[in-house]
A protein has these predicted regions:
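FAD-binding core/adjacent interface of flavoenzyme oxidoreductases
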Residues: 1-9, 25, 30, 37, ...
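Glycine-rich Rossmann-fold phosphate-binding loop(s) that bind the pyrophosphate
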Residues: 10-14, 162-164
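Glycine-rich FAD pyrophosphate-binding loop
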Residues: 23-44, 181-190
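Conserved N-terminal glycine-rich FAD pyrophosphate-binding loop of Rossmann-like flavoproteins
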Residues: 36-60, 193-198
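A Rossmann-like FAD-binding core segment of flavoenzymes
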Residues: 70-104, 109-112, 123, 175-276, ...
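FAD-site-proximal beta/loop scaffold in flavoenzymes
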Residues: 133-152, 246, 250-304, 311
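A conserved FAD-binding loop/helix module that cradles the flavin
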Residues: 168-170, 292-336
Length: 345
């Protein structure tokens, strides 16, 4: 059974930055994530979407951001367990400061002084079209629920369903890549950002995008691979066949907290309540950082999660080293920190 200072649930940006802050203080970490890759929603849902609000980095894609964080934590000792979910937490009170026994869905067990919940919005899965039986039979055969690579749609006839931010964002983003785009929504009104909707409607005026409202999907066309879809006018009930190479269903996500909701910690608005000094939950030794937590003034931004986990790691150090002062130094001038980072002899 492996013993660590911090067990981190979630390998997204905030979970990765936790490894960095912990490494500066000499704390050992392990990361657990139920996805099959590191990066959380950034890698799974929008790897090629740009991020503009990371301090000092004017523009980078979500995947570039994840890659930069992985590069940043290379000097530190940590392990990653993917395709696993934390199933059970059991407090171990045999020492002055208790530890946590953590068991995963694969049966792996860990003892950790602190547990950081950095699970973003929890586990998530895309919403399927409600009227279609088994749309996943065409998964990776023309149907997708997110954009992993923009190049996949180059010179393709693309059909996008949805009326929120993702549908509008990708309609605008892919307009210069796809051969043609038809955006289908069941209402004339959209739920996305007004500025993006304006951009989309400008593309409609120029003929780069065809807008079909109010329409809903009625059926899929194809045998081995997707060949198109049948859509129905919501008002007239008339149907129409649309031929296409690719379909993007962008109806949003179903979010689930999973076992986190059963751990007996205080919740608010389906998020984990924390204090704003240590970002500790109502249970000692359990911390929540990033989009999973809630407190007055909370903003669901990556940079806020970085701030939260930086302070939380200070308390994790105290738990692993009772009675010791938390060391503090600037990476620009502290030779011990620079040695840990591998930037000095």
């Amino acid at each position: 059974m492996k013993k660590v200072d911090i067990l981190i649930i979630g390998a997204g940006p905030v979970g990765l930055f936790t490894v960095f802050e912990a490494g500066l203080l000499g704390l050992e970490c392990v990361l657990i994530d139920n996805l099959d890759k590191i990066g959380g929603q950034c890698s799974e849902l929008y790897p090629e979407k740009p991020i503009y609000d990371i301090p000092g980095v004017p523009n980078q894609t979500a995947q570039e951001h994840v890659d930069a964080l992985l590069k940043q934590i290379e000097p530190f000792n940590y392990e990653v367990f993917l395709n696993e979910r934390v199933e059970a937490l059991e407090e171990q009170k045999n020492e002055e400061i208790s530890s946590w026994k953590v068991t995963t869905s694969d049966g792996n067990e860990f003892i950790s002084k602190s547990v950081f919940i950095a699970a973003g919005a929890g586990s998530f899965e895309p919403r399927r079209p409600p009227s279609i039986e088994d749309p996943d039979r065409f998964l990776n055969k023309g149907i997708s629920y997110s954009v992993k690579s923009k190049e996949k749609y180059r010179d393709k006839d693309l059909l996008i369903f949805g009326g929120g931010d993702s549908a509008l964002d990708w309609t605008v983003e892919l307009a210069g890549i796809a051969k043609s785009i038809k955006l289908v929504h069941r209402r004339d009104e959209f739920r996305g950002a007004p500025n993006t909707e304006t951009q989309m409607r400008e593309l409609v005026k120029t003929g780069k995008v065809e807008l079909k409202t109010p329409y809903v999907i009625e059926n899929l066309l194809g045998i081995e691979n997707i060949e198109g879809a049948i859509v129905k006018n919501f008002d007239t009930k008339e149907t129409e066949e649309i031929q296409c190479d690719e379909i993007l269903f962008l109806f949003g996500l179903n979010k689930k907290l999973g076992p986190i909701a059963e751990w007996g910690i205080d919740m608010h608005n389906k998020k984990v309540s924390v204090d704003t000094e240590k970002f500790e939950t109502s249970t000692k030794g359990l911390f929540a950082v990033g989009d999973i937590n809630d407190y007055p003034g909370k903003l669901d931004l990556i940079l806020c999660g970085f701030h939260e986990t930086t302070l939380a790691v200070q308390e994790a150090f105290r738990r692993s080293n009772p009675g010791e002062r938390v060391p503090f130094g600037y990476t620009t001038s502290n030779t011990k920190l620079q040695k840990k980072l591998g930037v000095t002899d």
